[in-house]
Amino acid sequence: MDVFSFVKIAKLSSHRTKSSGWPPPSGTWGLSQVPPYGWEMTANRDGRDYFINHMTQAIPFDDPRLESCQIIPPAPRKVEMRRDPVLGFGFVAGSEKPVVVRSVTPGGPSEGKLIPGDQIVMINDEPVSAAPRERVIDLVRSCKESILLTVIQPYPSPKSAFISAAKKARLKSNPVKVRFSEEVIINGQVSETVKDNSLLFMPNVLKVYLENGQTKSFRFDCSTSIKDVILTLQEKLSIKGIEHFSLMLEQRTEGAGTKLLLLHEQETLTQVTQRPSSHKMRCLFRISFVPKDPIDLLRRDPVAFEYLYVQSCNDVVQERFGPELKYDIALRLAALQMYIATVTTKQTQKISLKYIEKEWGLETFLPSAVLQSMKEKNIKKALSHLVKANQNLVPPGKKLSALQAKVHYLKFLSDLRLYGGRVFKATLVQAEKRSEVTLLVGPRYGISHVINTKTNLVALLADFSHVNRIEMFSEEESLVRVELHVLDVKPITLLMESSDAMNLACLTAGYYRLLVDSRRSIFNMANKKNTATQETGPENKGKHNLLGPDWNCIPQMTTFIGEGEQEAQITYIDSKQKTVEITDSTMCPKEHRHLYIDNAYSSDGLNQQLSQPGEAPCEADYRSLAQRSLLTLSGPETLKKAQESPRGAKVSFIFGDFALDDGISPPTLGYETLLDEGPEMLEKQRNLYIGSANDMKGLDLTPEAEGIQFVENSVYANIGDVKSFQAAEGIEEPLLHDICYAENTDDAEDEDEVSCEEDLVVGEMNQPAILNLSGSSDDIIDLTSLPPPEGDDNEDDFLLRSLNMAIAAPPPGFRDSSDEEDSQSQAASFPEDKEKGSSLQNDEIPVSLIDAVPTSAEGKCEKGLDNAVVSTLGALEALSVSEEQQTSDNSGVAILRAYSPESSSDSGNETNSSEMTESSELATAQKQSENLSRMFLATHEGYHPLAEEQTEFPASKTPAGGLPPKSSHALAARPATDLPPKVVPSKQLLHSDHMEMEPETMETKSVTDYFSKLHMGSVAYSCTSKRKSKLADGEGKAPPNGNTTGKKQQGTKTAEMEEEASGKFGTVSSRDSQHLSTFNLERTAFRKDSQRWYVATEGGMAEKSGLEAATGKTFPRASGLGAREAEGKEEGAPDGETSDGSGLGQGDRFLTDVTCASSAKDLDNPEDADSSTCDHPSKLPEADESVARLCDYHLAKRMSSLQSEGHFSLQSSQGSSVDAGCGTGSSGSACATPVESPLCPSLGKHLIPDASGKGVNYIPSEERAPGLPNHGATFKELHPQTEGMCPRMTVPALHTAINTEPLFGTLRDGCHRLPKIKETTV
């Protein structure tokens, strides 16, 4: 037995010779009556002897000289034979080195002298141990008369316990002629020992069941181990990858099904067969440690691959995967297995389900649960389809081979989340606290902790490479204490049932050898045997007499300094001192204490006794002693650097390296400190977790469970390819917060993204800020004894922004360039905009930056409306996190946006990715409560909700290019002359859980919080202008017929009702508008089913004879404050309206409306808006024509740039051509030519003309009835929607949400397309 295959042994270093070695060379070990090599014997204070095994770090009382059946080296024999004239020398030699006697000829000269298996070491006094076979043959042939051979029997091999070479030769010469039945019937009864579910075939003969249905029987004695059986089966079955296999016990219990128990290779068959209820068990030879990739196993070992396929088929049929194996997967696997069986047997070229059912039966391929719960007709129908679909697994023209089908079978099966893994229930012990936990152990999960069984959230607790060793100790009743020593921190202590504990330890050790180090065993039965089946180790207090053998006693004192920054001196004391003095008090004192040991040894028993809960520094202190075999132990002030683990370099650390206060005692920095932290600390610590979640899948622990969400490495930051849960709120067991030693996965060898030689740097944190577990010069730094992570706000903001951006990122294929470019442009303009915006007055207004629209830079830039303080709307706490400014550029085009969750399906035209993303994200807004009505101001920065308190427009003249702050209520209640922006109501409160946000919004609040607190009301659009207009140039024109006069809301509800009922324009100052105290859902027009909105359109609309001819009535148009003429509008209309095909009925006009910043005079004289009206605005100043042309130019330029760059999804389902005269996509498309064009027919619909676009008149139904007697029926007839009407504007790009109710709709009957984003040009 290779003693080096169990644990990593600490080395004794020599700085003089620069060499290290442990243990000493075997040449210094004498075969006397002292303990065997690597053992020492000592006595406790009671005088009882016990032994220390340095190979396995065990301390048993049993004498290893009696336990170990020491093998007596075989003695060489000299054999002299004379040549027979017929038979020669009478033996057959092999070709090995040395040459082995294969067989002895009966009746020949060598019979009775040579034994099959003898190794020929000398021929006639010539050594031939290393000689080639030809030389041996020549020497034998050269002996004519006689020959003198020196032979030796080889050392007994593990398989010799079953059959020797000599016995094999005898069996060949005299084979057994009689075969006995396995079931021996005595007096009509079958013996209990030979039943099918029995371990023993007969006394001392173990029967092992293979997955292919065969059985193998092995005779054993008291020293035969499980490993002997495995090696023999490896030879018999020609298996190369034996590391995947193990023996298991299948225990059948009535009513509870079967249970598989892993057997450790060091267990003896005697121990196994003497277990209670062994007569109800079977021994199985199985692949217990499945490979990650079945193709890799196929390349390395085809025999093991075939065995894995057969075993997997049996597991599926026998329902060993439980409820996780769904019916659809079971049917697909059965279809593949049927195909493989038919192709392999080559009975027929055609895959016939009838033939398969007749030949094998469906029960051979399907679990009984499927056969019992599904109708046979449906099963056959599904299988017939799936058998034919198997051909789709290969390219067309090629036939699926049986080997390919097996690979696909195993790949389908490997998707099961319990494939090769197991779930364990255990009790986690932390000092005095005990908590029930659920662990998941598997090749893809390592040792994972099921944090929340309701949401099935799982986090990686420790990777297999992080586990140094596993120890088991018997507890009360049937419980066993399992200690998982992970890295160099405090071990994980679990209380489990004995069978589960054994399975956990064996499974972890098996995967460690498979995936990490095949030469090392991290779990040894010696540890379990010392505690569970034998007496416990000695007391490690008091004085002990150490009987040190010569192999490890150092004759002189040697002192050298430890590595690195350590100051601890390692002293080897003269071996004449034969005592070990350990104080009776706790081994982790605050003052300086010493442990004097004159012989180097590592003792787990000492470690177990010296370790106290919550005293991690002391434990790590002693672990350094145990691993390095140090002979001097100082207090915490001279802690040693722990011996690095075999994979210690591949450790990524979680918390920063924060200095520990000298006044803090080590026990206060344990698990309890982290458990007592509040949510704030947990929120800080979550930023330091990394959530890669490459391949984690769900796990069905119970039939009701939907599936466990695996978030690799991350406990609180649930970012991955699975459903994300509420971060810290969704965690029911905050236990991983205390034992999250392993931040990286054990896929460090395969797919670890962390460097193996460096500490992991989280975010932008510097490398010195990461905890380095390899050592410290002052205090031992333990992951469980660190203060909460700290950091400046910038780091927290950066980490949180990265976290939220990762969550809120659009799905793959649904991202447009506006996401990146907007954030870049905003970041670039942030410093100067912040400085410019300091003079503005409304810094305290919370603003939700939904979409920042960059515009082309041309002309003079105006200062932004406000510092865009990103905050959640309607939040209980207004947390302002970041200020973003962007210059308001009025070069000619300002794109205004309104999100409408109500839209019809695509009308057949092209729909770009941004439109679909926004539509799908906003569609869920219909389900949310509507409890806020808020106005939004659309500027170049985004949409700014205007506070209800600030409802006043400044009456003074604004600075050059400046735009006065606007408010929601003022915009809603002010007359047309006081309204610089267009007011467009939003019928729904946008409250979406899946809304895409800009990066600024994500800086402080999490996406979940944002979604839960987002409430959006009516949306106001404002478009600023770079030019100031004169009042005379913008004088409004109104048709003579005034019986359909539009109404404007007044300062109060009463005034508003009276003025609108009288059909006259009322005028109020901008200050009076703040008295509108009831701007609620009931008073807004869009909240009533029968209410309609009417848009004050351009002055050019007043002269549209087509519209007037329809009913003979038009609405008076409010006076414009900006210089906007009908000619300019008519010239700009073709370019501005050609993109709004979808969403407009034929003849429906959404005219572009450009608002110019008004001067003080405009605001002070609102009466001028009503002073003059005329039938047609026939006379237009030349200056206005130039302005209109300039607007037309900028509109066309901006439209082309937006369409080419893909900003804000301009390439939507509407016609995207700027010059197109009409969109013809579907019934939702409409003529986009100007109204005066003969192509646009007249309909009985009226829009309020507005030369300047300074406001929108919305008229409740009860107030509109007397003023608009002829239009109520018309609107109801043409637009039979229960929801409120919305204004009509020119919409170059319309975005729609699928399957939602209309919000910004048209008046056309049967319109299937409603605009989502409306844009206004300047």
Curated annotation (Swiss-Prot):
Compositionally biased intervals (Polar residues): 1067-1080, 1207-1217
GO cellular component: cytoskeleton; dendritic spine; protein-containing complex
UniProt function note: Positive regulator of dendritic spine morphogenesis and density. Required for the maintenance of excitatory synaptic transmission. Binds phosphatidylinositol 4,5-bisphosphate.
Sequence ranges assigned to domain FERM in this UniProt record: 204-519
InterPro entries: Band_41_domain, FAK1-like_FERM_C, FERM/acyl-CoA-bd_prot_sf, FERM_2, FERM_central, FERM_domain, FRMPD1/3/4_FERM_C, PDZ
Source species of the chain: Homo sapiens
Protein keywords: Cell projection, Disease variant, Intellectual disability, Lipid-binding, Synapse
Gene that this polypeptide is encoded by: FRMPD4
Domain notes: The FERM domain mediates the interaction with phosphatidylinositol 4,5-bisphosphate.
Listed Low complexity bias regions: 902-921, 1041-1054
Top-level taxonomic group: Eukaryota
Residue span, WW domain: 33-66
Gene Ontology biological process: positive regulation of synapse structural plasticity
Protein name (database record): FERM and PDZ domain-containing protein 4
Outcome recorded upon mutating residue 1320 to D: Abolishes the interaction with DLG4/PSD95. Reduces protein localization to dendritic spines
Ranges for region Disordered: 809-847, 900-927, 952-983, 1027-1080, 1105-1148, 1160-1180, 1207-1227
Gene Ontology MF annotations: phosphatidylinositol-4,5-bisphosphate binding
Subunit structure and binding partners: Interacts (via C-terminus) with DLG1, DLG2, DLG3 and DLG4/PSD95. Interacts (via N-terminus) with ARHGEF7; the interaction is mediated by the PDZ domain. Interacts with GPSM2 (via TPR repeat region).
Domain PDZ: 78-155
Disorder: Intellectual developmental disorder, X-linked 104: A form of intellectual disability, a disorder characterized by significantly below average general intellectual functioning associated with impairments in adaptive behavior and manifested during the developmental period. Intellectual deficiency is the only primary symptom of non-syndromic X-linked forms, while syndromic forms present with associated physical, neurological and/or psychiatric manifestations.
Protein location: Cell projection, Dendritic spine
A Pfam match: FERM_C_FAK1
UniProt cross-references to SMART domains, sorted A to Z: B41 (SM00295), PDZ (SM00228)
SUPFAM superfamilies the UniProt entry points to: PDZ domain-like (SSF50156), PH domain-like (SSF50729), Second domain of FERM (SSF47031), Ubiquitin-like (SSF54236)
